[in-house]
From Swiss-Prot:
The keyword Transferase does not apply. One of its GO terms (cellular component) is cytosolic small ribosomal subunit. Belongs to the universal ribosomal protein uS15 family. This is Small ribosomal subunit protein uS15. SUPFAM superfamilies: S15/NS1 RNA-binding domain (SSF47060). Pfam families: Ribosomal_S15. One of its GO terms (biological process) is translation. Part of the 30S ribosomal subunit. Forms a bridge to the 50S subunit in the 70S ribosome, contacting the 23S rRNA. Keywords: Ribonucleoprotein, Ribosomal protein, RNA-binding, rRNA-binding.
């Protein structure tokens, strides 16, 4: 599987406030970004997989909502996570 418990733990350790921090906006945004990149690669090979395309659109929307929340709450944390993940904004 592309996202096992060890990979999730690695993401949470890198972007969360602690190694058990799964709820912070940064940790969730990083997890969504990993899943989005995986689904994007899947869709390059399977162009007619519409259920995956819908799931990808949903994930992008969730990540966008979290980014907007973080931007409104703490602009410095927002800029840091965008830079760390290499997002366009």
């Amino acid at each position: 599987m592309y996202l096992d418990a060890a990979k999730k733990q690695e993401i949470f350790e890198k972007y969360g406030k602690s190694n058990t921090d799964t709820g912070s906006a940064e940790a969730q945004i990083a997890l969504f970004s990993y899943r989005i990149s995986h689904l994007t690669e899947h869709l390059k090979l399977n162009r007619k997989d519409y259920s995956t395309e819908r799931a990808l659109t949903t994930l992008v929307g969730k990540r966008r909502a979290l980014l907007n929340y973080l931007k409104n709450r703490d602009i410095e944390r927002y800029r840091a996570i965008v830079k760390a993940l290499g997002l366009r904004k």
